[in-house]
């Protein structure tokens, strides 16, 4: 793949905003004219609504959803089914050619259970990129849900930020983590332009970066370190080109680049 792909992770709340989905996919269409794009998604709000309607309790530990094995049929249906197909339909309506997938398809990603206390929650790692590269070669838009599988065939629920990170590692791609926030905010709710490991640790110790945002930032930092390139946390309402041009959002900068840049900016 001669041009570096872009992996875009979208939060599940996007599913409740049809106009935002349209804006995002039109922006994707513009970028896809010159670079391959992959979308990875979660669906937390959809899962929570389904769990509540079924009378099933949904809890989190440190921002990660606890997933009993008996909940997996419903979570799999919500993420790999409803959420994935809603996004595929919106992409199709925007003139794209979506292909709905999950982490386990094509042996792209393999997962292991995180820990007993989390239940069927998976830790993903890269496996084989050949299938995904062949899909991208057809000028399609892979839209990948965060449902994975262990080597023994146990379905596992993977945090969507971590799912996007592993797909970016699989393709050596740039990674954008998009949600309904403009980026990482400081204690005064002002946008932080760039963070590295040291500043993340400082903000976390001050209680500024917590819970789901801490999971997001940690996943972004791990990917930035692995890829030796910045990872971007931004709003799905922003233009993708603007994010890549660093005019909006928060860059998560790997240690090597942070050292080269010294103490510039927020780093």
UniProtKB/Swiss-Prot annotation:
Gene Ontology molecular-function annotations: acetylglutamate kinase activity; ATP binding
Annotated Gene Ontology cellular component terms: cytoplasm
Subcellular location: Cytoplasm
Gene coding for it: argB
Superkingdom of origin: Bacteria
GO biological process entries: arginine biosynthetic process via ornithine; L-arginine biosynthetic process
First-tier enzyme category under EC: transferase
Signal peptide: none
Name by which UniProt lists this protein: Acetylglutamate kinase
Family named by the database record: Belongs to the acetylglutamate kinase family. ArgB subfamily.
Annotated site, Transition state stabilizer, chain positions: 9, 216
Record key words, sorted: Amino-acid biosynthesis, Arginine biosynthesis, ATP-binding, Cytoplasm, Kinase, Nucleotide-binding, Transferase
Protein's job: Catalyzes the ATP-dependent phosphorylation of N-acetyl-L-glutamate.
Pathway: Amino-acid biosynthesis; L-arginine biosynthesis; N(2)-acetyl-L-ornithine from L-glutamate: step 2/4
Catalytic activity annotation: N-acetyl-L-glutamate + ATP = N-acetyl-L-glutamyl 5-phosphate + ADP
Annotated substrate binding sites: 43-44, 65, 157
EC numbers on record: 2.7.2.8
